């Protein structure tokens, strides 16, 4: 039974890894309110109003999520000077929040982490499998989604980051941005 479920999940991940939207069908992301780890309320548009963002959804029990987040932290540092940000949304229940805070503090992530225990945004964006990454333009439209994580996916995400930075800027230097390396880190 486990093998059947695992096979079905892999088949779903392979078929749904990259979903790009044409301009005519781009959807606006709902502007929901979340709490950060200091219990401060923040709205989603505060993050994308100054540049494009990558939103990743995760839980503490999702090992692929945690592997992906290491790479997202590096990409956030690398591309933040271009107005790009990574925003992480944890969907664990409030009773595990202390463990989530301890984990994120130990990892020293370079991006903001918000809490959405009801998985409201995840569901509104059609999420069903984690990790889920959603690229959002600075006008609030959803550029693309990536479902699941396999070693090497960080290179695909980096290319998408460069594309979204370039398409959201008129600066010719930014439009010619290239990955600094094609290095793939296998863990």
Name every feature range the model reports, one short phrase each.
Residues 102-109, 117-162:
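Thiol/disulfide oxidoreductase modules built on the thioredoxin-like
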Residues 2-11:
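Bacterial N-terminal signal peptides
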Residues 166-187:
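Non-globular targeting/processing and membrane-anchoring segments
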Residues 44-63:
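Short active-site neighborhood of thiol/selenol oxidoreductases, capturing the structured segment around
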Residues 15-45:
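N-terminal "domain-start" segment that seeds a small globular fold
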Residues 54-55, 86, 133:
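Hydrophobic beta-strand anchors of alpha/beta hydrolase catalytic cores
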Residues 66-107, 117-123:
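Structural microenvironment flanking redox-active thiols in thiol-disulfide oxidoreductases
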């Amino acid at each position: 039974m486990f093998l059947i479920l695992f096979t079905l999940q892999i088949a779903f991940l392979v078929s749904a890894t990259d979903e790009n939207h044409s301009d005519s069908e781009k959807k606006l992301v709902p502007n929901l309110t979340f709490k950060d780890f200091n219990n401060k309320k923040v709205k989603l548009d505060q993050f994308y109003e100054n540049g494009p963002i990558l939103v990743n959804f995760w839980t503490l029990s999702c090992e692929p999520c945690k592997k992906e987040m290491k790479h997202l932290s590096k990409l956030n540092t690398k591309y933040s000077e271009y107005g790009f940000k990574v925003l992480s949304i944890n969907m664990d229940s409030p009773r595990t929040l202390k463990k989530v805070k301890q984990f994120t503090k130990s990892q020293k992530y370079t991006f903001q982490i918000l809490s959405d225990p009801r998985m409201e945004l995840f569901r509104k964006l059609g999420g069903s499998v984690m990790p889920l990454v959603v690229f959002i333009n600075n006008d609030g439209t959803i550029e693309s989604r990536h479902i699941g994580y396999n070693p090497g996916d960080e290179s695909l995400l980096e290319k998408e980051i460069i594309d979204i930075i370039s398409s959201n800027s008129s600066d010719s230097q930014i439009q010619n941005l290239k990955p600094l390396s094609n290095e793939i880190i296998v863990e």
